[in-house]
Amino acid sequence: MSGVVRTLSRCLLPAEAGARERRAGAARDAEREARRRSRDIDALLARERRAVRRLVKILLLGAGESGKSTFLKQMRIIHGREFDQKALLEFRDTIFDNILKGSRVLVDARDKLGIPWQHSENEKHGMFLMAFENKAGLPVEPATFQLYVPALSALWRDSGIREAFSRRSEFQLGESVKYFLDNLDRIGQLNYFPSKQDILLARKATKGIVEHDFVIKKIPFKMVDVGGQRSQRQKWFQCFDGITSILFMVSSSEYDQVLMEDRRTNRLVESMNIFETIVNNKLFFNVSIILFLNKMDLLVEKVKSVSIKKHFPDFKGDPHRLEDVQRYLVQCFDRKRRNRSKPLFHHFTTAIDTENIRFVFHAVKDTILQENLKDIMLQ
């Protein structure tokens, strides 16, 4: 019996040895595969780290209506990403809304300011317009908008409405209303589609976070726009991680205007207070902060007739001399900085002027790369 067992054992040994060898080979293969996967993961992580280091993340900050969204639209136009049909229709809806709401504001302001109609028959046009309501916020169809075009045209020609417009610093009115009313014949056509200039002037408050990615000479850029109204500012902190630079936008022409949110606070003072908080935050010690004093086109016109000294008594110089006003504005923001070791980069801009923004951003891009990405050389 024992002989039979020994014989069976000798027969089984080669089979067991082969099985052990196969198991060992499978284990070696699994180990090699695990090492290969680990190398692939390490390589992927390294590429992602390099991409993150190369990414230029620019945060657009500033009070509401300072021009951040317009600047972002310019980046899209300048860097070749066309607006599709859906976007154009959305801009058309916004423009119709801007015109109707802005005209209603003017009709209401004329009444409250006690300005008489030039032509009494325009009162019925005003009543027709004031009866318009869109509480649901639904898009206004071109055919519907056309019904209001005759009333809008007649009202805009009336000197009473024009006088109310000239006193717009006394109430809240969108800055693009005049442009759109001046172009009403074109915009009122049934087949109207917005031009690039129309798109730049279309005003819709930013809610949430809007991003735009583009590449300049192999360097990836991410530009982030966050709503500037007080109710939206708590969202700013969601965007602070990994930022390379902050472009702080200021509406330089609003030194005689108050906030829409509280109707008391001077808009320029509000911008200065926000800037002071941002520029002195320890989170941004190594972040370049560039000041954009925007709406230069409006500042040029306003300086001629509205004295900044009336609203900022510490102003020294000629309140109707553009260079004096510009110097004062820069000084106001510069004084808010506690850390004087870094220079304050600033530019006067007109966000609706594509060539101006193209020129300014070229300089800003170089500043950002020199200050924050000295290890990256543009090809």
Curated annotation (Swiss-Prot):
Post-translational modification, as annotated: Myristoylation of mutated N-terminus in place of original palmitoylation restores the transformation activity.
Membrane topology (UniProt): Lipid-anchor
Cellular-component GO terms for this entry: brush border membrane; cytoplasm; heterotrimeric G-protein complex; lateral plasma membrane; neuron projection; neuronal cell body
CDD domains: G-alpha (cd00066)
UniProt key word Transcription: no
Residues reported in the UniProt entry to bind Mg(2+): S69, T206
Residue ranges of the region described as G4 motif: 290-297
Protein name, UniProt field: Guanine nucleotide-binding protein subunit alpha-12
Lineage: Eukaryota, Metazoa, Chordata, Craniata, Vertebrata
Binding-site residues, GTP: 65-70, 200-203, 294-297, 351
Alphabetical UniProt keywords: Cell membrane, Cytoplasm, GTP-binding, Lipoprotein, Magnesium, Membrane, Metal-binding, Nucleotide-binding, Palmitate, Phosphoprotein, Transducer
Subunit field text: G proteins are composed of 3 units; alpha, beta and gamma. The alpha chain contains the guanine nucleotide binding site. Interacts with UBXD5. Interacts (in GTP-bound form) with PPP5C (via TPR repeats); activates PPP5C phosphatase activity and translocates PPP5C to the cell membrane. Interacts with RGS22. Interacts (via N-terminus) with NAPA; the interaction promotes CDH5 localization to plasma membrane. Interacts with CTNND1 (via N-terminus); the interaction regulates CDH1-mediated cell-cell adhesion.
GO-annotated molecular function: D5 dopamine receptor binding; G protein activity; G-protein beta/gamma-subunit complex binding; GTP binding; GTPase activity; metal ion binding; protein phosphatase 2A binding; protein phosphatase activator activity
Lipid-acceptor residues (S-palmitoyl cysteine): C11
